[in-house]
Amino acid sequence: MSFLSVSRLAPKLLNSKNATYFLVAARNASASTTNLKDVLADLIPKEQSRIKNFKQQYGKTNIGQITVDMVYGGMRGMKGLVYETSVLDPEEGIRFRGYSIPECQKLLPKAPGGEEPLPEGLFWLLVTGQVPTEEQVNWVSKEWAKRAALPSHVVTMLDNFPTNLHPMSQFSAAITALNSESSFARAYSEGVHKTKYWEFVYEDSMDLIAKLPCIAAKIYRNLYREGSSIGAIDSNLDWSHNFTNMLGYSEAQFTELMRLYLTIHSDHEGGNVSAHTSHLVGSALSDPYLSFSAAMNGLAGPLHGLANQEVLVWLTALQKEMGGEVSDERMRDYIWNTLKSGRVVPGYGHAVLRKTDPRYTCQREFALKHLPNDPMFKLVAQLYKIVPNVLLEQGKAKNPWPNVDAHSGVLLQYYGMTEMNYYTVLFGVSRALGVLAQLVWSRALGFPLERPKSMSTEGLMTLVGAKSG
């Protein structure tokens, strides 16, 4: 059994008497090196062999049925992708390589004096399936700092965008322009053997993740801070700390929030628009810059990455209409009136989840610790108490519980980041951790070009024996 397989057993052992022994053994499995690429080079052949054997034995096994509703319904619930880095359970929420968010908060290394996990540690976990040591996380921080500088043509491009161009459009365009630096594109054009693809995708992915905070911070400064300088990367600081410094925020609590935000938004299984897009475009052997840029164009859509902005707009309108503190009864009436008018309560419900999103829960815990008396947080907390019961009474919602978007905007606002148009860029910086970790594995495992079969309505009707008319 490969280490990746064994590591997925860790959550089941966390509460057992063997938990401490197991976690020490897991860390020691590759703790002798701090170089992530070396660890990957050891893991990949074992995983290739494991999957080859699995396919030989079970390749023709049926794993589910496809209905007409699934085909018309955005392929919802259809099992059609292999995505290794995270799995979304309807009852538990997201698990990163088998670890829940609370487990990641407990196990992943933190900054000195910090309480939230470092995104570098999560990236190591997503790539390897292993909980990293502090030394390994520190290596990633320094590696990203070393790779962070932007080429001059990208800086010039960002400085010349019109101010009315949406931050996500700027973000995507700048990422596409980084394609000039692609190691993978260059190696492919020179005829590199396909068994080496993953090495160059890894290099591009590390470079891209390193540069994203610089791109995002430059967009923020150009649009909202009169084009002031983002400053220089400090190789002694972690990825999130450098990011908040470049954005112009010096408060330690905001940096802690950013570490949490970038960790919990990083990955959410493979079927969501941004993850699936990067997987699809990458399957054409487009380099990581092109693949991730395409993913960001999907994330920019209002049904994917703009939800936290919509929540904040709705909360602000609610607060303005209702005034100061509102009784639970009045709030309940307001929610009912919202639903009866044909509108929805933004931030509630999820395509897969059937319980409160654990990403919401950890943000709520952060707020309870750091901003318990903030009026907007108190409003969010009041809604959490009322909305699910109203939605259950209405009887239409499959999931009446809050999702991640119900909370994140309120936290950012509290620390002074009020520019709602920018929030999806933060989401994009975070999402790189998950989709690029998977992209490396997709090339390592030799996943082919994605090419599902499409059908016309007439063809579907013929297939199921329905009469057209």
Swiss-Prot record:
Any one Gene Ontology molecular-function term assigned to this protein's record: citrate (Si)-synthase activity
A biological process term (GO) from this entry: tricarboxylic acid cycle
Lineage: superkingdom: Eukaryota
PROSITE patterns: CITRATE_SYNTHASE
Biological pathway: Carbohydrate metabolism; tricarboxylic acid cycle; isocitrate from oxaloacetate: step 1/2
Catalytic activity: oxaloacetate + acetyl-CoA + H2O = citrate + CoA + H(+)
CDD domains (alphabetical): ScCit1-2_like
Keyword Manganese listed: no
EC category: transferase
Signal peptide per UniProt: none
EC number: 2.3.3.1
Binding site for oxaloacetate: 359, 431, 451
Residues annotated as transit peptide in the record: 1-30
Presence of keyword Ligase: no
Keyword vocabulary terms for this entry: Mitochondrion, Transferase, Transit peptide, Tricarboxylic acid cycle
Subcellular location: Mitochondrion matrix
GO cellular component, one term: mitochondrial matrix
Active site per the UniProt annotation: 304, 350, 405
Subunit comment: Homodimer.
Family: Belongs to the citrate synthase family.
More info: Citrate synthase is found in nearly all cells capable of oxidative metabolism.
Function: Key enzyme of the Krebs tricarboxylic acid cycle which catalyzes the synthesis of citrate from acetyl coenzyme A and oxaloacetate.
Name used for this protein in its record: Citrate synthase, mitochondrial
